[in-house]
Amino acid sequence: MKAGLRIDVDTFRGTRFGVPNLCKLLAACSMSASFFFSVGPDNMGRHLWRLLRPAFLWKMLRTKAASLYGWDILLRGTFWPGPVIGKRLSTVIRSAFDAGHEVGLHAWDHHAWQAHMHAMNEEALYSQIKKGYDLLSGILGQPPTCSAVPGWKCSEAVLLAKSRFAFDYNSDCRGQSIFRPIVAGCELLQPQIPVTLPTYDEVVGRNGVTDGNYNDYMLSLFDPEKLNVLTIHAEVEGIACLEMFEQFVRAACSKGICFVPLRVLLEEYPQSAAAAIVEKEIPGRQGWVSCQSNASGMVV
């Protein structure tokens, strides 16, 4: 069974330490994945102000965020401008590409996207994407062919802005099948490959799921009859939970699960009927995420 492995790289620390760790692990298992990089300023520490929201505070406590992410991530860009990841760590990003992994754009400024994208019009969104697109193109020596928005924060304006780039596909939402997004009654050409499985921070500490049984729980969610797309984070599975993720990958292999870049799924799975992207709340995540409108059977 082939399953898409999407690796989101949100921060300077995740790029510097998590990406090389994950590349080494995947090479040892003869697997490749899709890495989506944030390449602009690392201002993730500015999310600390969200601690004033009870749901976000509970999530931070439930996942033991300080030990999970590290204080350098939690404070980065809070009191001073964060480093531009793509300029400081271009060799790390390029090394993932040279190792045969698919490399796509996550964001220019990950924090700014999550915090302000809803207030941006299409041109402002295009400008944000263009900054990241241009820097990543320079690093890779060619334009990136795919993208994935931070935090599954997407909108019709985002989809229209992305349609102005030569992306083969985007992965901007949660769902259950590959589809063409509908905007203002029209089907866009760029397909969406949605994430079908929950992330570590959405399930650990809930419903009896702990680090001790997390791998078994996640493996139980894979369905050979359906599209399977898993998102991990370089900051989590690539650093704090690296050993646990290595055990997960080896257990998945023993069950016949082979992780592949998302682009492979375009060839393996037919695109279903077109669908709109809508905002929904899902268990374990604070606030809304973008979801495939007809995805009634999502695993959360």
Task: Show the residue positions of the predicted features.
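Active-site clefts of carbohydrate-active enzymes
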Residues: 200, 232-235
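Catalytic alpha-helical scaffold of carbohydrate-active enzymes acting on polysaccharides/glycoconjugates
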Residues: 1-146, 151-191, 209-230, 237-300
